[in-house]
Design a protein with these regions (language model features):
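Surface-exposed amphipathic alpha-helical tracts and adjacent flexible/coil segments at the periphery
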Residues: 1-154
């Protein structure tokens, strides 16, 4: 089963690819935008290969059957008002972490919150509790159901 984060990320990538192609469908060449593969690499996935596209004789197998998980889904945006995003935690992040917010329209907003406040309005250093309600500053207007993610620490 795939998570709604996976579905949202893959749908955003496919939408970008389709829009790019449909901008000039009569063209003999189509270069997939880097942003499409970049978005696909932000989800949990197995290594990519052309598989059997070039026939059984030239089939390529991936080097590993393990999943690539370089990014964590860390929360959802419930609402945004006056430069403040109201969010629900899915995984922990800490003050100073660099985040990305994937909006329902496929746009991505980078943000490094200057503060985090819990549901009581108290400043906190992290979001350690499952389904914790918190707020962070974000100057860019955000749509409800936007998804927060963070690159895993090495």
């Amino acid at each position: 089963a795939k998570t709604f984060y996976y579905v949202a990320s893959v749908t955003a990538a496919y939408r970008k690819a389709l829009d790019q192609y449909l901008a000039n469908p009569a063209s003999d060449t189509f270069d997939l935008p880097y942003s499409v593969l970049d978005e696909l690499n932000r989800t949990s996935h197995r290594h990519y290969s052309p598989g059997f596209y070039f026939g059984k004789e030239k089939a390529l197998q991936t080097p590993s059957h393990t999943y690539v998980r370089d990014w964590d889904f860390i929360g959802t945006v419930d609402s945004w008002e006056d430069g403040v995003a109201h969010c629900t935690q899915r995984s922990k992040f800490c003050l100073g972490d660099s985040l990305e917010i994937l909006q329902p329209d496929g746009s991505v907003v980078p943000v490094t919150p200057e503060w985090i406040k819990n549901a009581e309005g108290e400043a906190v250093d992290a979001t350690p509790h499952p389904m914790m309600q918190y707020t962070i500053p974000c100057a860019t207007p955000l749509m409800p159901y936007s998804l927060l993610r963070m690159q895993k620490r090495q």
